[in-house]
């Protein structure tokens, strides 16, 4: 459970997380040592104590326990138990819903962030070209997926890529009727529709790209659908 605390009274954010991950904050952030807090493993999966009791102690030690505190209530890893615990431990604080607050701030990218996203765009373009060149009737879907992964991670001669937040989504045939399936070990068939939803990633900055392919002869229904989409665009 790794999170950040941003306070108007502090020059830097505060990182907190599991003890074994504390050094990751030292290696990958600019934070000073006094802004990195790592809790011990007895907080993990313990019904008698919770990591946010530790977080409450951090806020108390920094004089933030009586402030207005906005929490990201729709974050994937900020559970109802986290919210209940922090409210119980900080009775003098005022809690507000900070839904999407950080995302709104991060909409405006720095020049460096834009550079990273452009590099991710080159990586995903290469990965998509690999998929286009390799997908064919009789080719196994899993072999294409392996080549796509290689392109995503190997990146370019100048810089490499990283794992993406989600696996390549590349269903074929009837499986395209639901968008979030990926490959199987079956081979591509004549007439298959193939959805490709890929991503390039450079230093955790993503650039997604989606394309649709038809193998062999498309049915009239698919042709009509394509014409309608083109007209709409």
Predicted features and spans:
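Active-site neighborhoods and metal-handling regions in enzymes and metal-associated proteins
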Residues: 1-233
């Amino acid at each position: 459970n790794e999170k950040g605390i941003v306070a108007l009274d502090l020059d830097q954010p505060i990182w907190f997380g599991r003890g074994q991950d504390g050094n990751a904050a030292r290696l990958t952030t600019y934070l000073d040592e006094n802004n990195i807090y790592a809790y011990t493993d007895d907080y993990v999966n313990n019904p008698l104590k919770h990591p946010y009791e530790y977080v409450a102690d951090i806020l108390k030690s920094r004089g933030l326990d009586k402030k207005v505190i906005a929490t990201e209530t729709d974050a994937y890893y900020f559970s109802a138990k986290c919210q209940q615990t922090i409210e119980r431990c900080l009775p003098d604080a005022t809690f507000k819903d900070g839904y999407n607050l950080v995302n709104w701030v991060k909409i405006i990218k720095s020049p460096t962030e834009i550079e990273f996203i452009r590099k991710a765009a080159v990586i995903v373009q290469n990965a998509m070209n690999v998929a286009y060149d390799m997908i064919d009737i009789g080719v196994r879907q899993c072999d294409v997926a392996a080549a796509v992964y290689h392109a995503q991670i190997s990146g370019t001669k100048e810089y490499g890529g990283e794992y993406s937040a989600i696996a390549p989504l590349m269903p074929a045939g009837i499986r395209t009727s639901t968008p979030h399936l990926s490959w199987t070990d079956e081979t591509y068939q004549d007439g298959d529709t193939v959805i490709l939803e890929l991503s390039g990633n450079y230093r955790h900055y993503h650039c997604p790209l989606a394309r649709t392919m038809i193998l062999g002869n498309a049915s009239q229904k698919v042709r009509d659908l394509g014409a309608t989409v083109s007209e709409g665009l």
